[in-house]
Regions:
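Serine-esterase "nucleophile elbow" of acetyl-processing enzymes
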Residues: 1-59, 190-191
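Alpha-helical cap/lid subdomain in secreted, periplasmic
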Residues: 22-25, 44-206
Length: 206
């Protein structure tokens, strides 16, 4: 039985159990209960989540937390910082597996045009101020694509396979998103899980 490590934020938590079930005939899927949040946080905690184990494949994503705006209208992590953090992360991950798959960050929905002053990742109660904000849909998704492209280029050059979850969601965006405009609904999670599982299964077969 192969061993796979699956890492990512709350969206990974949403599709993780489904991925594990879909791959149960070929792999044991190890994943933390904890939200892996932004890239630096994933890097900091990676050894804790991975343990003293070598994996046949590691599949991961980080990005949505990095891309959130702070109250001076700047991203929590600049694009340059995001790329540098991913460079550091890859150096670490390579010590645990030679088969690596990085998943793109998914787009946001049109509800962001109405909720841009509130961060649904942190608190659902609008009465409480939050310092981490989203923005309107077009600006948000433009940023997601920019960060995705920068990381994709780096990872492709370095032999990491890309799992394009952005495109999976984009084709049926409003049908696959929940009411918060950031997290998928059940249909969205099922589509992401199937795509991730198919990607992992294909890479494990080589």
């Amino acid at each position: 039985m192969k061993k796979v490590l699956l890492l990512g934020d709350s969206i990974r938590i949403g599709y993780g159990k489904l991925v594990s079930d879909l791959l149960s005939d070929v792999a044991e899927v190890v994943q933390p209960v904890e939200n892996c949040k932004w890239t630096k946080y994933l890097y900091w905690n990676f050894a804790i989540w991975a343990g003293e184990t070598k994996y046949d494949l590691i599949h991961w994503n980080s990005g949505i937390w990095d891309m959130h705006y702070i109250d001076n209208n700047e991203c929590f992590c600049s694009l340059e910082e995001y790329v540098r953090d991913n460079e550091r992360l890859l150096q670490l991950i390579r010590k645990y597996s030679q088969k690596l798959v990085w998943a793109t960050t998914i787009p946001g929905g049109k509800i962001l045009n109405q909720r841009k002053a509130h961060n649904v990742l942190i608190n659902t109660n609008r009465e409480f101020p939050v310092r981490m904000l989203t923005t309107d849909q077009d600006t948000w998704n433009c940023g997601v694509q920019k960060y995705n492209q920068a990381a994709r280029e780096y990872y492709k050059i370095n032999g990491v396979k890309i799992d394009d979850l952005f495109s999976v969601m984009q084709e049926h965006l409003e049908d696959y998103l929940s009411e918060d405009g950031i997290h998928p609904n059940d249909k969205g999670y099922e589509a992401l899980a199937q795509h991730a599982a198919d990607t992992i299964r294909r890479e494990l077969s080589f």
